[in-house]
Amino acid sequence: MARYEDLPYRSCVGMMLLNPKGLVFIGRRVGGTELIDPAHVWQMPQGGIDPGEDYWEAAQRELLEETNARSIEKLAEATDWFTYDIPRMIAGRSWKGRYRGQRQKWFAIRFTGDDSEINVASPAGHKAEFVDWRWEPMQNLPNLVVPFKRPVYERVVKEFSRFAGE
């Protein structure tokens, strides 16, 4: 197995889904190797980029697969890629030990539908990644995620703060 320091980052997309009031969708994770802290189980949708897929296409697909949200409008794309390292203690279990963390392209997306459109139990027929969800004020997000993702969430909040609600 490669040394942790030599492992690449997995490229993926992250989606900040905002309702018309400027609150952000967060989902409570089903489980998985990233859940090392039971007090921090919430996160925004994120996922991999398929071969041949552009970043916005990946964001739309992943959002549908995780939330069932179809009524959306792109607000902004982050200017930079944001990266995080997963803790060494779970690096061998996450992504079969092939990556040291993720390199993420983030999007701010307006949800224009009714809350009943969101379905995390069986989103668009895909396996559930969340067991619960809610709308949360943007400034609260960094304190709800696992600590190793917190710096990315702080940057995402700063990048998209102009879309926050009161």
From Swiss-Prot:
What role does it play? Accelerates the degradation of transcripts by removing pyrophosphate from the 5'-end of triphosphorylated RNA, leading to a more labile monophosphorylated state that can stimulate subsequent ribonuclease cleavage.
UniProt keyword list: Hydrolase
Classification via InterPro entries: NUDIX_hydrolase-like_dom_sf, NUDIX_hydrolase_CS, NUDIX_hydrolase_dom, RppH
GO BP terms in the entry: nucleoside phosphate metabolic process; ribose phosphate metabolic process
PANTHER family attached here? NUDIX HYDROLASE 26, CHLOROPLASTIC (PTHR11839:SF22), UDP/ADP-SUGAR PYROPHOSPHATASE (PTHR11839)
Q: What is its EC number?
A: 3.6.1.-
Species: Afipia carboxidovorans (strain ATCC 49405 / DSM 1227 / KCTC 32145 / OM5)
Motif Nudix box: chain residues: 47-68
State the SUPFAM superfamilies in the record.
Nudix
**Which residues does the UniProt record annotate as the domain Nudix hydrolase?**
8-158
| EC main group | hydrolase
Regarding protein family, the annotation reads: Belongs to the Nudix hydrolase family. RppH subfamily.
Q: Which cofactor does this sequence's record say it needs?
A: a divalent metal cation
Which CDD domains does its entry note? NUDIX_Ap4A_hydrolase_plant_like (cd03671)
Q: What is this protein called?
A: RNA pyrophosphohydrolase
A GO molecular function for this record?
bis(5'-adenosyl)-pentaphosphatase activity
